[in-house]
Regions:
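DNA-contacting surface of Y-family translesion DNA polymerases
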Residues: 1-122
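Acidic, metal-coordinating catalytic segment for phosphate/diphosphate chemistry
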Residues: 96-189
Length: 189
């Protein structure tokens, strides 16, 4: 240490401390929030039809949106990734009109992205990811095409479903499309 301090002054001591795993900076107790939320699954069988693929995507959207709501945040960017049986992965993303944590809204965007992305190859892995996450509540820009959509009602319904699942388990309440489907669980991941 003394030789380094003699030649490099204060920097010599810092270099010696770093080289020996010593750090005098304060430990930050507050952790950074998540920058994104996502979920993906490797499917036990090759998915060759759009219906099954969209069921898996719905299941992934359920878990991602529930995690967003649990942390009281909304995401502005949604992305989908698809890996085929040859292990080739492709993905697309889209910026939403407004940040959201509503399952149906995320799922609708995911379906559009999937339709743009999938070329019909057998699917082995699917993923849904969100980013540009924020806590602040921004106003939603009204659209002529959304006049009949009650986002507040959809959000309250999703939160009620979350409470039921938290109290009674993930299978206590599920979408009807999962009832007869033995291949895909209602909450994947």
């Amino acid at each position: 240490v003394e030789i380094l301090k003699c030649h490099l002054k204060k920097q010599g001591e810092s270099i010696w401390n770093f080289a020996n795993g010593r750090d005098t900076s304060l430990v930050e107790s507050e952790s950074q929030g998540n920058k994104g939320y996502g979920n993906s699954t490797t499917i036990a069988f090759d998915v060759t039809d759009e219906g099954t693929a969209k069921m898996v995507l719905l299941s992934l959207c359920e878990t991602v949106a529930a995690r967003l709501r649990k942390d009281d945040v909304k995401a502005e960017v949604v992305s989908v990734s698809v890996r085929d049986f040859e292990m080739k992965t492709v993905s697309h993303q889209r910026v939403m009109a407004a940040p959201t944590n509503i399952t149906g809204e995320i799922y609708d965007t995911v379906c559009v992205l999937f339709d743009e992305l999938w070329d019909g190859m057998p699917i082995r892995h699917l993923g849904v990811h969100t980013s540009r996450v924020s806590k602040e509540e921004r106003g939603r820009q009204m659209s002529l095409f959304d006049l009949n959509t009650n986002y507040e009602k959809m959000e309250k319904m999703d939160m009620a479903v979350d409470k039921i699942r938290k109290k009674f388990g993930n299978n206590a309440i599920m979408r009807a499309s999962f009832l007869d489907n033995k291949k895909v669980e209602n909450m994947t991941g």
